[in-house]
């Protein structure tokens, strides 16, 4: 951006034609309007650096829930003690959510303090729907809360680092930068400027030429207000300073080149002639850049002394026969950089850059705030998720192969209405007082309903009778049970986890592990679906 503007300025220096006629009314009006546009920047609102309070509040609520779900012993470690200075580094142990003590100590202590009111943790638990949970259930919720709390802590750290690293991008600092460019360091309005501020940094001269420039010396003026004075203020030799080169209503300046004692007050009066602005929106960086370019594009070329305004000869004394202007000197090597590095231009460009950076930071802060709020919402919505997981566990428990098959067999037994057919189908006949008999599943004769094709294995098509492997005390007879089976049903082996006499070799059911793995796979799949 800066390079493009500088290139445009240099091009104008080389190409703009100079007119050495005496200054007349209205000659500098276009520059006056441009300078007024720049001065209006000082009245505009400036955007603020985005706050982090929404994200910090969300994190605080997450920690309050964490503390509320912890046991009393843990809460006591962080509870505020009346009349004693709390040491934030002496807590031992670890929270139920297994967060790092050194990094979270302050947050836990603050959470305990926030929960120290008359109602304690009841409002927090009520908000999460966890008022009546057991201690075991609290541990379950804390386990689920842990990754959320860790993620929130990491985001909060990002948020704080970003905000503290952008402390210089406040609206106050940006406004001060703009005001420095317009009126001088420390001045907040045209009428607050001083003569020394108007004369320019380090200027010990006492004439208008010293401020505005002359044939052999570049201008010392370094604020927009000083440029306004140089380009618009009249001179005593021209109708008592009443020449109106900028505005038909501008005040007269009946002062000679050597008298600048009240130049700063006259400059403020000229600023009062500027048009007002009804724009209430925050100032944008592009507006600053545009206002700068609008003025700097009007630089005129002269013989190694480019200038703004009206010039005839000698220098910018204010006389219509000499110059009402701001002049630079480009005779010696390196002097041309002054044209590209006008102090107030550089300062305003810096203010524009600060606004751009602030807007970028604000977008990131808003995003992190929203992330923390989303995590807070998730933390306080754990109950329905964990209840769903419990239901899935219960469903899986019911779906365990042995139990499921027993229920299926019970359904088959119900179809038999006679004591003569019931026992033949691995069922048993039950009667109450010798009457009202019914056919029910015989637990000692568990059968499984399979999808085997007709004729496969033993028994009827699609049905397999599960042998009583434990009844065999001989390895050979044990393994004979597998004859004709596509999958071994018995095996001479030591016990697995969950089986009795694990160290003893005996004939055992070969489907034990398959059933356990099936049940675990259902639970695992259900929990994975719950999380993702």
Curated annotation (Swiss-Prot):
Membrane topology designation: Lipid-anchor; GPI-anchor
Extent of the signal sequence: 1-23
GO cellular component, one term: plasma membrane
Lipid anchor positions (GPI-anchor amidated asparagine): 509
Function: VSG forms a coat on the surface of the parasite. The trypanosome evades the immune response of the host by expressing a series of antigenically distinct VSGs from an estimated 1000 VSG genes.
Low complexity composition-biased segments: 450-470
Bias-annotated ranges (Basic and acidic residues): 427-445, 472-484, 494-504
One protein family per Pfam: Trypan_glycop_C
Protein name (Swiss-Prot/TrEMBL): Variant surface glycoprotein ILTAT 1.23
């Amino acid at each position: 951006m800066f390079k493009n503007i500088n290139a445009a300025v240099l091009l104008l220096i080389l190409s703009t034609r100079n007119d050495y006629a005496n200054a007349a009314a209205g000659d500098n009006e276009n520059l006056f309007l441009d300078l007024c546009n720049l001065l209006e920047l000082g009245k505009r609102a400036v955007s603020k650096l985005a706050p982090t309070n929404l994200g910090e509040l969300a994190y605080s609520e997450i920690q309050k829930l964490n503390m509320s779900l912890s046991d009393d012993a843990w809460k006591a470690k962080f509870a505020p003690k009346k009349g004693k200075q709390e040491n934030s580094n002496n807590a031992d142990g670890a929270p139920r959510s297994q967060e790092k003590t050194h990094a979270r100590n302050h947050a836990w202590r603050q959470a305990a303090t926030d929960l120290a009111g008359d109602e304690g943790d009841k409002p927090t638990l009520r908000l999460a729907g966890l008022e009546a949970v057991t201690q075991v259930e609290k541990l379950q919720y804390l386990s689920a809360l842990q990754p959320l709390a860790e993620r929130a802590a990491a985001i909060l750290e990002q948020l704080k680092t970003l905000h503290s690293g952008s402390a210089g991008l406040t609206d106050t600092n940006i406004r001060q930068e703009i005001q420095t460019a317009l009126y001088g360091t420390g001045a907040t309005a045209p009428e607050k400027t001083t003569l020394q501020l108007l004369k320019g940094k380090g200027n010990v001269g006492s004439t208008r030429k010293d401020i505005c420039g002359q044939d052999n010396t570049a201008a010392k003026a370094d604020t927009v207000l000083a440029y306004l004075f140089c380009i618009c203020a009249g001179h005593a030799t021209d109708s008592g300073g009443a020449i109106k080169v900028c505005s038909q209503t501008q005040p007269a300046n009946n002062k000679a080149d050597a008298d600048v004692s009240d130049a700063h007050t006259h400059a403020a009066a000229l600023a009062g002639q500027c048009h007002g602005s009804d724009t209430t929106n925050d100032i944008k960086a592009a507006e600053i850049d545009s206002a700068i370019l609008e003025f700097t594009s009007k630089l005129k070329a002269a013989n190694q002394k480019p200038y703004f305004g009206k010039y005839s000869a000698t220098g910018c004394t204010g006389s219509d026969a000499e110059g009402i202007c701001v002049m630079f000197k480009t005779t010696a090597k390196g002097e041309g950089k002054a044209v590209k590095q006008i102090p107030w231009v550089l300062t305003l460009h810096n203010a524009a850059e600060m606004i751009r950076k602030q807007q970028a930071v604000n977008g990131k802060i808003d995003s992190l705030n929203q992330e923390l709020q989303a995590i807070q919402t998730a933390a306080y919505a754990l109950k329905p998720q964990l209840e769903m997981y419990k239901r899935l566990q219960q469903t899986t428990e019911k779906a365990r192969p042995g139990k499921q098959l027993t229920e299926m067999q019970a359904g088959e037994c119900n179809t038999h209405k006679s004591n003569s057919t019931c026992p033949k189908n691995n069922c048993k006949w039950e009667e109450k007082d010798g009457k009202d008999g019914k056919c029910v599943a015989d637990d000692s004769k568990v059968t499984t309903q399979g999808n085997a094709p007709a004729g496969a294995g033993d028994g009827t098509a699609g049905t397999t009778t599960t042998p009583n492997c434990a009844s065999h005390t001989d390895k050979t007879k044990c393994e004979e049970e597998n004859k004709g089976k596509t999958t071994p049903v018995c095996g001479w082996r030591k016990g697995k986890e969950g089986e009795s006499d694990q160290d003893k070799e005996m004939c055992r059911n070969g489907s034990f592990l398959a059933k356990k793995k099936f049940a675990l796979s259902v639970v695992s799949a259900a929990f994975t679906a719950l999380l993702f």
